[in-house]
Amino acid sequence: MKVLSFLIRQDHLLYLDIFAKQNNLTRSDAIRYAISVLDEESTPVSLVGFPGIKLVRTSVKLAENVISRIDRLAILSKITRSDVIRNAIYHLLINNAPKQLPPVTAQTEKKYGYVCPYCVSRFPTVRALKIHLKRRHNGFPWCPVCYKPLKNKNATNHFRRFTDPQHQFWYMISRKRYLSSHRKEAVKQ
């Protein structure tokens, strides 16, 4: 076993841990599984990057045969080990997100507050989250559920198309009228 250090998006690391917990795996096992899926499917490793997304450095213990698989994929695609691991995790999340992975924001409001999907900052109210999204991330650069790139104008329409609770949650937040109606309710109380 060797310790391998790599860079990963903070929210993807959180989703990976949720996936591992749901399937009774360790983080290392989840990464090994993601690499094997990527290798067996012979998926061409395409770089998945979103500008302005913070990457964090993390380390895992992996067997030498897994590291050699990572190196082989890295050499074939002419990218780094970190890129291979990031892509393997990304593909794992893409395939499992709609069915198995709850969005970070689905956790209870009282305990966690609302979580920004892009930088994993926590906010006590929807209003605070919405203001943060507008100022810091210029709205919704990509869908937090299915990772599809979005333009700000079509974000609300994208969320409205889907009936699953995850997309509906973001539809509720992306609506323009949500803030004003919420303010009126607060005034009434």
From Swiss-Prot:
The record's Gene Ontology biological-process terms are: regulation of DNA-templated transcription
The entry's keywords: Metal-binding, Zinc, Zinc-finger
Q: Does the keyword Metal-binding apply?
A: yes
Per its UniProt record, what CDD domains does this chain match?
A: RHH_CopG_NikR-like
Note the superkingdom of the native organism.
Answer: Viruses
Spell out the molecular function terms from Gene Ontology: zinc ion binding
Coiled coil start-end: none
Q: Which Pfam families match?
A: RHH_1
Gene3D superfamilies listed in its UniProt record = Classic Zinc Finger (3.30.160.60)
| Zn finger residue spans: C2H2-type | 114-137
Kindly provide the name given to this protein in its UniProt entry: Putative zinc finger protein ORF189
Q: Which organism is it from?
A: Acidianus two-tailed virus (ATV)
Organism phylogeny: Viruses, Viruses incertae sedis, Bicaudaviridae, Bicaudavirus
